[in-house]
Amino acid sequence: YLAPQLYWSLASSGQPFAGLLGWWAQQNTQRRHLWPGMAAYRVADGSSSPYAATEIANQVLATRSATLAGTGVTGGLLYNATAVRTDRGGLTTLLGGGVYATPAIPPATPWLDAAPPPAPTVAVTTGGTALTVAITPGAGEGATRWLVRWRDGTTWRQRVYPATQRSVALTAPAGVSAVDGIVVNALDAVWNASADAVWRPGS
């Protein structure tokens, strides 16, 4: 992957973050993962020109711009961990409640292995306030993880489990009767995803 250190602000008059990222995207002709480094260390750093936490949140949004679709910009890196670990300037709170509120899996790296694993099969039993999903691997390339998604009322939730775990219990705050769909995918070592294994009530 490419990780250029783009530590300038979005409003920089000479080298704005978005412009630099666009240039790097143009150079990325092989469409490898391009994850710009963002200067989290500058948030409330006591200097004469600190960043507000919103600068980093807005840079994350810039990496998700539709104009960058298909260019290899599939995420970003925060440098360094101190500001995140200590929630300096409210950075961790802002990111966790906003641009990073929803868990995500890493993007696949198909140039290392383009073949997805076979889809698993699933069986679901209900009891109390939880559903138990039994997962049986498909024949062929072994999975390293399971991506399990379920809809509880109007909210989609997801978790990643190791492939050695063949049974998972899903909680349903709105009640098990509110869960109207479960989707399981096998993930391989480079995060290729299998076809969906889908469960619906009555299936």
PLM features: residue spans?
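Beta-strand-rich modules
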Residues: 173-193
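Extracellular fibronectin type III
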Residues: 189-203
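Substrate-binding cleft of secreted/luminal carbohydrate-active enzymes
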Residues: 1-14, 24-111
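Solvent-exposed loop/turn segments flanking beta-strands in beta-repeat/beta-sandwich domains
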Residues: 138-153, 158, 179
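Short beta-strand segments within Ig-like beta-sandwich modules, predominantly Fibronectin type-III
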Residues: 159-165
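Proline-enriched interdomain boundary motifs that mark the N-terminal boundary
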Residues: 114-123
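Conserved aromatic anchor
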Residues: 129-141
